[in-house]
């Protein structure tokens, strides 16, 4: 009999290293800022006052004043960038102060290229109109070089940027995010470099084969099964792998295992490894396989993330759900006899007390 198991895990995506082609090097005393984004996680930014002193001074002044607290990411284009910091939430607001554009077409040498993870200032057609709105590159965009003031880089939390871009609900090709769906920056504050480096180290450790998965935000820590690792894929999706078996995960949550009865019913309905990803988006199929009603399942759906748990485990499941960073998409994974032991090792570590 073919066995099925569900691996429901916290997915971490990783910050890419600085490009070898970049002329700038991270100074030990470069200021660091953290953006805490509700339901997503923390983005640590290293700023470069040696490259764009006016821009960095302006950004830090706004951070120190609490200006960004409660503002949002209002424009998101996956494969391009995520823009935020507008007090009106529509791209037209400013801080009441405009600064000189520090880029080559405006007479200022700025060697920082608009690569993935780079932080830059938004502006209108006026080269000196930048004020408070910023954007973080989701992918390289060399056509922006020389025309916008790049002034920093993500050093930890690029996975948060990936999640923002992957989960954004936009209404047009310009990346407009409806007000009610805009990710909220709960806090923007200066951060210790040691704090940022520790976050980056956790990302690296969680991405290594073997080792310990450590996520202080959710209070979870468990040994990675032998032969398994969390890796970054070209499309920004992470995958657990154990040789031949690769399991796609876009969830940013901790998930619970289905009971054997639900797995049996799910298999009896004709679902196979190849069809599970498609079925993951069918709430009716989930409700039937889990033995819960459509209303119960809807109740467990938050910001586009499907939450599936057997009724007896609901309280514990919701606890773990809230500990995780939401706005992911759960992918139900089917394993064969070879994969089940490794999957169950992870699930065992996530058992609710």
Give the role of each language-model region.
Residues 22-209, 256, 304, 334, ...:
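Cyclophilin-like peptidyl-prolyl cis-trans isomerases
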Residues 41, 203-238:
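N-terminal "mature-domain start" segment
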Residues 1-7:
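Bacterial N-terminal signal peptides that target proteins for export
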